[in-house]
Structure formats: structure tokens, C-alpha cells
Amino acid sequence: MTRIESTFEILKAQNKKALIPYVMAGDPNPSNFVGLLHDLVKHGADMIEVGLPFSDPMADGPTVALAGERALAAGTSTRDALKMVAEFRQQDTQTPIILMGYLNPVEIIGYDNFVALCEQSGVDGILMVDLPPAEAGSFTQHLTEHSMNEIFLLSPTTLPERREQVLTHCGGYIYYVSLKGVTGSATLDTDDVATQVQAIKAETDLPVCVGFGIRDAASAKAIGAHADGIIVGSALVQNFADIDGNDATAVAHAQQKIMAKMTELREALDSLSVSSNG
């Protein structure tokens, strides 16, 4: 059982929903990043998605794309991101880390080398936005052999053939994209998300987590009522926009705002388990 799988087992036994923050590796600066990960855990993260900076992030909305630009400007590479995860693992051996990114940097490193580096660093899951599930066979197998899960996206516009492939190859959890667009865009239709999540759950035993468009306690609670977890990115990383990543005071203030948001989201999700037990 992978760390992701065991975490969901524990959450299920506790009747809790997973809170999964997304942050960009090296944003706002590499020296702060490991501390940021630990703070996220202290403020309720059950697992963390770490973005790998890439120069052409086609699925990222402006907020996350700018986070990637800041990380790249600070000199953060995929190998640097893995070193940060390894440093995090020295003090935290429990919280799953999922890398989210694009294939090009992985292909430069080489698939086998990348998997080996991920295992050495303590990575638990991989989500490559531009890797079609039908073409992921050997990569998925290699990850599985090294106790990691490969995670895929499903969205309202996923075609039936691809949906079937995702449900066949996905591990850890299904990442359901709640909006038809890029990250951080549009507004949530919670009734539609509820219907879609129920349909996915009828086809798989994997947990279903919902991302894109969750920004506050109300949306967290509305989605958490139906999903096994929520993924929140833009609402967190937007706090690093327009600050100087080398200004320690500005960075600390931005992190305080992120942790306040984490507390808000955690309390919203936990209120669901209280109400369902009550």
C-alpha cells in the first residue's frame, strides 16, 4: 500500500475529507519552500501537490503560471524540486507528496532516472498533465513497482474512451477537474460536480478529489460534501503574487495569509464530518 492509499484509508476511518494544497516548487523562493511545506501540514494538509516549474504550462491559469515563472526566475529546476522534497522527508515521513507537471522536463531527465530520483526523494505520486493514459503503460508500471501512484485528470469534457483509460490506469486518487478551463477560472457548479463525482464513484473504488475553483470555506464545504477530498491551488499561491520573493517580511506575511486560508478550509471540511456524525 502506498503512502497515498494508506492516508485515504486513515481519513476514511476517521470520516474525514482530504485537504490537498497545491504549491509551486521554489515559489516565492527556494530557501523558503521546505518550511512552507511543513507549515501546510501543521495547518491541516493531508497531502501536498507540488508543481514542477515549466516554461509552457498549457493547463495552468494565470495565477499558477505566474507562480511557475517566479520559480523559474529563482532558478528552480525539476531536480531542485526533488531535492526540496527529499529535505522535507527528513522531518516528515507521513505526508504524501504528489508532483504535478509536464512531460518535457521528465523526458530530459529520462523516465527511468526520473522515477529513481522520485523514489529516492520520497515522492508518492505523479500527475503529468500532458501524458495520455493510453500511452502511460510502462511509466505507470515503473511507478507502481516503486510504490508510487500515477494520477490522472478527469473533467466534464473528458471523452468516454479516455475516461475509461483514466479509470483503468489511475492510482491513488482521481483528480476531477470541476471547471471547463484552466486553473483558477470560472465559477463552480456544485450540483454538476456532485452529479459527476457520484458517476465516477459508481465506476471506481478510487477516492475522488476535486480541484479547480475551490477558493473558500463555502466552496470547500459544498464540494467536500460529495468528494473524498479537495485540491486548492490558485487561492493559496495568489498570495505570493506581486511580492519580492527575497523580502523576508513580505514572504512571511504572504505565508501567514496562506495558512489562514488553510485553517479556513480545514475547519470547513471538518465541519462535514461533525455534521455527518451528529
UniProtKB/Swiss-Prot annotation:
Tree of life domain: Bacteria
The keyword Amino-acid biosynthesis is assigned to this record: yes
Alphabetized InterPro entries for the sequence: Aldolase_TIM (IPR013785), RibuloseP-bd_barrel (IPR011060), Trp_synthase_alpha_AS (IPR018204), Trp_synthase_suA (IPR002028)
GO molecular function, a single term: tryptophan synthase activity
Cross-referenced SUPFAM superfamilies: Ribulose-phoshate binding barrel
Active site positions: 49, 60
Coiled coil: none
Annotated family: Belongs to the TrpA family.
Protein function: The alpha subunit is responsible for the aldol cleavage of indoleglycerol phosphate to indole and glyceraldehyde 3-phosphate.
Protein name, UniProt field: Tryptophan synthase alpha chain
Organism annotation: Psychrobacter arcticus (strain DSM 17307 / VKM B-2377 / 273-4)
